[in-house]
Regions:
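General marker for long, soluble alpha-helical cores
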Residues: 1-243
């Protein structure tokens, strides 16, 4: 063997004695986020709202949810077709501040941001003196909403997004619930403004396309550090017990 090839072989053999153990490292010895990503790098597809899928992608999604031998190929192809180039792995984003929101069903996320709308309701209710309106508000809330409302009713918040105009409310529970959801979604979107772009991308794709577009338009800077911090604390408190 030529000396230079012998030297190269010796170097390769020497290095592989150090590399091989690392390659054989068991998944359970790795950080959970890395191990989960290696096991299934396309796990977010289980959470993806189907409004993002069309034609071939919808068929790929159906195969990806099955036990078909084509499952891995379908998930890989679908994932590469929808994800932006710079997106971080889903498992990594779950470990970010606020990231745990992403690992729960979309109905739980909706319930969480609807709770946030009760902060707006509490602010407006302090300005109302008409007993009939206050009674109608109480009658329109679910038991969970009543309990949460009671816990934050007198809690100060440094940011006010304006009146709900409850004096002109028709006293229909469905009307109030719609307002609460819209206001809560606004707080939710603004609270997540400082979050990593990957987290916001995953959240938007957890929601349907219309909700995602609304989130994108509402996710703006409140330009007040104290208010921004409080909004994030409100999100954490609203989701507590749901997550």
């Amino acid at each position: 063997m030529h000396p230079k090839y012998a030297l190269l072989k010796a170097l390769v053999d020497r290095e592989t004695t150090h590399v091989a153990p690392g390659l054989r490292q068991k998944l359970e010895e790795m950080p959970a986020a890395i191990a989960n990503w290696i096991t299934d790098p396309f796990s977010f597809l289980d959470h993806l709202d189907t409004s993002w899928l069309h034609g071939v992608n919808k068929k790929l999604h159906q195969i990806g949810l099955s036990s078909s031998p084509m499952r891995a190929f379908a998930r890989s192809t679908l994932w590469l077709s929808i994800k932006p180039r710079q997106i971080l792995p889903f498992e990594t984003v779950l470990a970010f501040p606020m990231g745990n929101i992403l690992q729960h069903p979309v109905n739980t996320v909706i319930e969480g941001y609807k709770r946030l709308g009760l902060y707006d309701l509490a602010l407006d209710a302090r300005r109302i003196v008409q007993t009939d309106i206050l009674q109608a508000i109480a009658a329109s809330l679910s038991e969970d909403q009543k309990a949460f409302y009671k816990s934050i009713q007198h809690m100060p918040t440094p940011i006010d997004f304006g009146r709900l105009s409850l004096e002109r409310w028709d006293k229909q529970p469905s009307t109030l619930q719609t307002v609460i959801e819209k206001r809560g979604f606004n707080r939710f979107a603004k609270a997540l403004y400082p979050c990593h772009p990957s987290l916001k991308w995953y959240l938007q794709h957890l929601l349907n396309k219309d909700k995602a577009a609304m989130f994108n338009s509402l996710c703006t800077d409140v330009k007040n550090k104290n208010a921004q911090h409080t909004l994030q604390e409100e999100v954490k408190f609203a989701f507590k017990g749901l997550l």
